[in-house]
Structure formats: structure tokens, C-alpha cells
Amino acid sequence: MALTAEVLFVNTDYIKRITSLNGSVEDSVVVPAIILAQDKYIQQYLGTDLLNYLKTNVSSLTGVYETLMDTYIRKATCWWTMVELIPNLYVKLDNGGLVIRASENTNPISEDDLHREVERARANAQFYTERLVSYLTKNSSSFPQYTSNVSPDMHPEKVAYNQNGLTVSKGKNFFKYGGDRKPSVLDNSPYDC
């Protein structure tokens, strides 16, 4: 069975242009973080149907879909990629196990510095995600795929905000709608959001 190619909303050149990521970082290190960012964070706010629609049509988007992609999704994807990538630039998994990356002319940063850089990237990602969610909720009638998800698809989270370093979202309660996520203390009630 052949693996299908992943459709990426951003490429490594875009990430290196928008962030402080050094141009010498290999694409093979960055691409897995892009894929993870799209699956783990972006899908959470787009929902499965809109994500799949955008992936299918990424090279031919026009109108509101092009605006959504170019103005909102790409920057959010870029910074969520950095949240996932920064720890991988610090630690490397090789034949000998986990090692801290270092070259001859550099010194590795402390864990505190690492966490600070991840949190800076997360703050940027949350900023762009809040803009994305705001745009989608205000213009949901322009995006029929935003509201067409049915179980087992991911339903989009409709609110995103930051509280004490955590991104807190309120969307459909997946437990109520047939998902396998049990209600948590972050839910307004165990049965409805």
C-alpha cells in the first residue's frame, strides 16, 4: 500500500521567512512538525470537513477560501509548527537514544530557555488562532464545510483563548455527540457546552 503525499498549508521557506528559524535547518526536520501542527491544532479549529476541503483545493482556492488560507490559516499553522519544532531542535533521537543537539560553534540552551521559546511560539500561535476562529465564526455562512461535520469527524472548536499558558476551547462536547472524549472539568457541564 502506497502512502499518500501530505498536503501542507505552509512550506519550509514560508516558516523560515515568517519566524526566526535558521535557513540551514533541514526540511526533513521541519515537515513532520508542519504535519503535526495541521493535524493536532489546525484541524481542531477548522473541523475535519473544512480541513479536507482546503487540502483538496489548496492550489486553486479563490475568494473567501483564499482569504481564509492566506490571512488566517497559514500564520496559525506556521506558529503551531514552531511550538512542535522547537523541542525537536533541542533534542535529537538517534541510534544512541535521546541526545541534546549541539554543534562545534554553539552551546545548547537551558531547559528554561527552551520552555521560554516554546511559550513565545505558543503565544504567537494562539494570537493567530484566535483571529482564525473569530473570522470563521463571523463568516461561517461562507464556509458550509465548517458546520457540516458528523461523527466521527472532528467538530471545530468555536472559541479559543489563553489562560495561564493553556489554550482553552469550548466547542461541541464530543462525549455527548458520540466521541470517545469524556467530559472534563473544562467543560461547562458534563453534557453540554
Which residues does each predicted region cover?
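Catalytic-loop motifs flanking and including active-site residues across diverse enzymes
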Residues: T77
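Conserved short "hinge" loops at termini or chain/domain junctions
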Residues: M1-R74, N88-C193
